[in-house]
């Protein structure tokens, strides 16, 4: 996880195309300039970055389901709940599942756990569009390889 670059995903643990679900793992860095202000003497992962982490996990699920052919963009967040704090150095297990799609939008349900304890969850809405340019397509394909997105020909389904 590289907070300053909003790169929230470390690795794909499982991509189940048939079950329309993904599991991701990410470690919150032990140190980051973000923690200098959130909060001095008691560093906590900001809720907005936890939401971004769930959105990115959902995005990788949708990219997988679309075989990296179209780009999901976050369009809405509903029912976000934060149940406890996330501290530097903790390992996050992020799960996202497709809830429904239609009318040009897709909805996922995502949650984050630390040590098998749920820390937050949300319903996330995405608009899926063609890639805006070849640079974005290349970046997504390179990132997919870096985080270990399974070959889409062999991924669980």
Stretches with model-predicted labels:
Residues 57-93, 119-123, 127-129:
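Hydrophobic beta-strand-centered segment that forms part of the acyl-chain substrate-binding groove
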Residues 4-45:
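Catalytic strand-loop segment that frames the active site of acyl-thioester-processing enzymes
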Residues 21, 88, 97-157:
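HotDog/MaoC-like acyl-thioester-processing domains
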Residues 6-8, 92, 106:
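Hydrophobic core residues within well-ordered beta-strands of beta-rich domains
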Residues 38-46, 50-60, 74:
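Compact, glycine-rich, soluble single-domain proteins
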Residues 10-13, 78, 83, 97-99, ...:
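Conserved positions in beta-strands of structured domains
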Residues 26, 95-98:
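Short, hydrophobic/aromatic-enriched beta-strand segments in well-ordered soluble domains
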Residues 1-3, 67:
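Short aromatic-glycine motifs in intrinsically disordered, low-complexity regions
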């Amino acid at each position: 996880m590289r907070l300053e670059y909003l790169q929230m995903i470390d690795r794909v643990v499982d991509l189940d195309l048939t079950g329309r679900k993904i599991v991701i793992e990410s470690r919150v860095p032990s140190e980051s300039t973000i923690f200098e202000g959130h909060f001095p003497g008691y560093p906590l992962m900001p809720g907005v970055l936890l939401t971004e982490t769930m959105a990115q996990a959902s995005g990788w699920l949708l990219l997988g389901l679309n075989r990296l052919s179209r780009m999901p963009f976050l369009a809405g967040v509903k029912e976000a709940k934060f149940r406890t704090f996330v501290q530097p150095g903790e390992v996050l297990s992020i799960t996202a599942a497709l809830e429904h799609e239609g009318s040009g939008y897709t909805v996922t349900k995502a949650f984050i756990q630390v040590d098998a304890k749920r820390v937050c969850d949300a319903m996330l809405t995405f608009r899926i569009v063609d890639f805006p340019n070849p640079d974005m397509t290349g970046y997504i394909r390179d990132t997919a390889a870096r985080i270990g997105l399974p070959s889409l020909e062999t991924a669980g389904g």
